Amino acid sequence: MLQYIKNKRVLFITTKNPDYIRNTQEIAFLEEHASFYTVIASTHTSYPKRLLSIYRRLLTVHMNEYDTVFLGFAPQLVLPLFAWKFKNVDIVEDFFISMYDTLCCDRCKFRPDSYIGKLLHKIDRLTLSRADAVFCDTHAHAQYFAQEFQADPDKLFTMYLHADTTIYHPMSVNRPAGLEGKCIVLYFGSILPLQGIDIVLDTFRLLDHYANLYFICIGPIQDEKLTNPRPMSDCIQYINWLPQEELARYIAMADLCLAGHFHGSIGKARRTIPLNAYICQAMKKPMILGDNAANHELFKESDNILFVEMGNSHALANEIIAWWKKHPQ
C-alpha cells in the first residue's frame, strides 16, 4: 500500500469537513510519507453545497501534476463521477463506510432488495473494484467488504481510528456538589442505531434504584425512535450535546464509560470499533465494550477493559455492578 503514497505527489479528496478526525489522521499520514499533497475539501455546512464545491474544483484540477489520488470519506460520491479523470493515476480509497450497509442494513432507509438497495450495492462494489489500495477501519470490515462486494483481499489494509489527543487525554476535574462518593457511569455518542441506545437506557432503568450509582447520557436522543420511553430518575442525567472540550471533562469525571457498540442484531455494530473506545483509551478510562471481533482486534479483557454480550441490557447491568463492587468509591 505504501508504494502508492511514499514519495508520491498525492491529491487528497474528501467530502467530509477537513477537521473530521479521519481526515486529520489521513492528512497526517500524507504529511509523513508523500513528497507533497493537495487537499480538496469544503467547509460548507450544507452537504450538497460541499459536494458541488468539490466537484467544481475537480473539474479544473490537472491530474498530470499527481501520481496518486487519495479518496477520503465517501469515495462512492466521487469515483463514479470522476473515474475518467483518474485513469492515469493510482487510486487509494478510505472505504470507511459502505453506503449499502449503512443505509440498508444499519439505518434501514431502504430494503436491501429494493432498486435503491441494489444500486447502492453496485456502487460500493464498483468503487472498491477500481481502487489500487483500500483503507478499512477494522479487519472485520475488510473481511466483510471482500465477502459482500468481492473486493480483492490483497488490496485491503486496516487503518485504525485514533482519538484527538490534543483534546482527549488524562485530566483531573472537580465533581459537582452531590456527586462526591458516587460511581459515575457515562455513555456518550451520536445515537446512531448500531450504537444500541435502547440497550443503554434499559440498563439505566435496571439500575436506577442504586443510590450510589449516577448515570450520564450525552447525545441527541430522539424519543420517538426509542422502543421504550427513556427512564427518568434523579440518578440519570441527559445532555443533548457538548463541545468536545467539555465532553472530555465529563469523560474525565466518569468512573466507568460504556463504549459499545451494544446493538445486538445490526451486523455493522460487530465490525466497527467505536470512536468512544479510542477516546476512553486515550483518556485511560475504564470501559465496557461490546463483545465482537472488531473490538477484540485492539482490546484485551482486563480489570478496566470489559466485554459484554451485545443486545443484552441485563448482561450490561451485571457487568456494571461487578465492576463497581471491585472499585468502591
Where are these regions (language model features)?
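Conserved donor-binding/catalytic core segment of Leloir-type glycosyltransferases
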Residues: L11, A177-Q195, L201-R205, F215-I216
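Glycosyltransferase donor-sugar binding loop
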Residues: F188, Y214-T227
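Acidic anion/phosphate-binding donor-loop and adjacent secondary structure
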Residues: A146, H162-A177, G196, T227
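Conserved acidic donor-binding segment of nucleotide-sugar-dependent glycosyltransferases
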Residues: E301-N312, A322-P328
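Nucleotide-activated donor-binding/catalytic signature segment of Leloir-type glycosyltransferases, i.e.
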Residues: K225-L256
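Carbohydrate-associated surface elements
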Residues: A140, L161-H162
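Membrane-proximal helix-turn-helix segments that form the acceptor-binding/catalytic region
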Residues: Y55-L59, M99, S114-V134
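Acidic donor-binding loop of glycosyltransferase active sites
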Residues: I251-R270
